[in-house]
């Protein structure tokens, strides 16, 4: 073969090899295109960028302080598994000085949560972290399978969302922890922004886009270190690191409104890859400027019309002043209904209202319990499937 021909072949091979190299280190073979910016990276460079970005998010938002005890909301899924792995790595690498604990919620979904908890228990040994499991059955005397059998599958996420948030708070309080971190990622935040906009619930944008939030009346704060991290990158990190996680979707998730928002987000992302971050930034800027507004009652307005009233009468009317919170709830003083920091009259847990949301939902279930006959555990096991089939029938 002529020398010139060999030169052409060798140069073309060299070009192919150069195009397959990592765009960051230019020394190792690229194994992926980063979803966030389509950059070709090798595994080592991807690990470094992924971990460094999360470290920068933690530092820039002052999420933790030295010596703080942190509960990691662990479900066994990819997000919480990667979160536990990353926090352990960063805690050791940058000497955060954190005391990390795994906190899991057992909703009582047979064939799903029992398998995922087995993954969490393996993670406990792998990461050498304490594990606390809190169950719906112990806290509320209801499992999610029983709730679905009573209320229907379409209401499952409404009940589970409220009960899970309170269960996380109670589990953290039991451990003496004031800070819970969750694996909510950029896709989750963008989906929540879309859901709130589609429902016309602009008041909830602040809590859905904040990296750190608290529940009304609760001293437990929650943070999202993965707020700016794409779900695809979390999956890639778990895959290349060969992390042990549970990948099955919740039995009741397909019926949730979030699934509709997720499909919409995927369609938008296929057209504009940056739409996830764009939606998050839009949600942050769409937050209502006044965090709290004063809404005057009729009695309070009448006070200004009659200036001859005594000071004592005026003070009495001021007690009727209502404060509207960002989430749309109303906090009254002790002579009204409730004030932030008080407790639910039924369960005794912290609540800004007379009766907490969890107790209101559970009370409705108790009323309907008599209408549902559950013979044994096997009937409960198939309750979700039976309910789903019945709801698909048309008469």
UniProtKB/Swiss-Prot annotation:
One CC-aspect GO term: cytosol
Keyword presence, Membrane: no
Keywords, sorted A to Z: Cytoplasm, RNA-binding, Transferase, tRNA processing, tRNA-binding
InterPro entries from the UniProt entry: CTU1-like_ATP-bd, CTU1_C, Ncs6/Tuc1/Ctu1, Rossmann-like_a/b/a_fold, TilS/TtcA_N, tRNA_thiolation_TtcA_Ctu1, UPF0021_CS
Disulphide connectivity of cysteines: none
CDD domains in alphabetical order: CTU1-like
Residues covered by region (Disordered): 297-335
Single GO term (MF): nucleotidyltransferase activity
GO biological process, one term: tRNA wobble position uridine thiolation
Location(s) in or outside the cell: Cytoplasm
Pathway terms, separated by semicolons: tRNA modification; 5-methoxycarbonylmethyl-2-thiouridine-tRNA biosynthesis
Major localization listed first in the record, in broad terms: cytoplasm
Broad enzyme group: transferase
Protein EC: 2.7.7.-
Biased composition (Basic residues): 297-309
Protein family (similarity comment): Belongs to the TtcA family. CTU1/NCS6/ATPBD3 subfamily.
The protein's role, per its UniProt record: Plays a central role in 2-thiolation of mcm(5)S(2)U at tRNA wobble positions of tRNA(Lys), tRNA(Glu) and tRNA(Gln). Directly binds tRNAs and probably acts by catalyzing adenylation of tRNAs, an intermediate required for 2-thiolation. It is unclear whether it acts as a sulfurtransferase that transfers sulfur from thiocarboxylated URM1 onto the uridine of tRNAs at wobble position. Prior mcm(5) tRNA modification by the elongator complex is required for 2-thiolation. May also be involved in protein urmylation.
Record's protein name: Cytoplasmic tRNA 2-thiolation protein 1
Origin species: Candida albicans (strain SC5314 / ATCC MYA-2876)
């Amino acid at each position: 073969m002529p020398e010139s021909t060999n030169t052409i072949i060798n140069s073309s091979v060299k070009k192919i090899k150069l195009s397959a190299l990592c765009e960051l280190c230019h020394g190792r073979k690229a194994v992926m295109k980063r979803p966030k910016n389509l950059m070709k990276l090798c595994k080592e460079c991807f690990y470094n960028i992924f971990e460094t970005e999360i470290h920068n998010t933690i530092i820039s938002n002052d999420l933790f302080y030295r010596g703080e005890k942190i509960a990691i909301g662990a479900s066994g899924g990819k997000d919480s598994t990667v979160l536990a792995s990353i926090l352990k790595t960063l805690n050791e690498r940058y000497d955060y000085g954190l005391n990390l604990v795994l906190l899991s919620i057992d909703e009582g979904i047979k064939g799903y949560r029992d398998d995922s908890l087995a993954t969490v228990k393996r993670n406990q040994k792998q990461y050498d972290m304490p594990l606390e499991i809190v169950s719906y059955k112990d806290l509320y005397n209801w499992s999610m399978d029983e709730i679905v059998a009573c209320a229907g599958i379409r209401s499952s996420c409404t009940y589970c969302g409220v009960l899970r948030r309170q269960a996380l708070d109670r589990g953290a309080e039991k451990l003496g922890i004031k800070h819970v971190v969750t694996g909510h990622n950029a896709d989750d935040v963008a989906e929540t922004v879309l859901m709130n906009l589609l429902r016309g619930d602009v008041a909830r944008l602040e809590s859905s886009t904040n990296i750190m939030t608290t529940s009304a009346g609760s001293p437990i704060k929650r943070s999202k270190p993965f707020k700016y991290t794409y779900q695809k990158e979390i999956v890639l990190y778990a895959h290349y690191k060969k992390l042990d996680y549970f990948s099955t979707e919740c039995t009741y998730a397909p019926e949730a409104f979030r699934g509709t928002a997720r499909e919409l987000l995927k369609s938008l992302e296929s057209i504009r890859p940056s739409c996830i971050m764009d939606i998050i930034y839009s949600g942050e800027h769409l937050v209502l400027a006044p965090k709290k507004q004063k809404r005057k009652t009729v009695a309070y307005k009448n006070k200004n019309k009659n200036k001859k009233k005594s000071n004592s009468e005026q003070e009495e009317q001021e007690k009727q002043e209502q404060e509207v919170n960002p989430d749309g709830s109303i906090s009254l003083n002790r002579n009204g209904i409730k004030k932030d920091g008080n407790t639910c009259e039924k369960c005794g847990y912290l609540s800004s209202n007379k009766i907490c949301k969890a107790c209101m939902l559970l009370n409705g279930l108790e009323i309907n319990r008599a209408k549902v006959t559950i013979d044994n555990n096997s009937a409960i096991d198939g309750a979700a499937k039976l309910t789903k089939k019945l709801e698909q029938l048309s008469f």
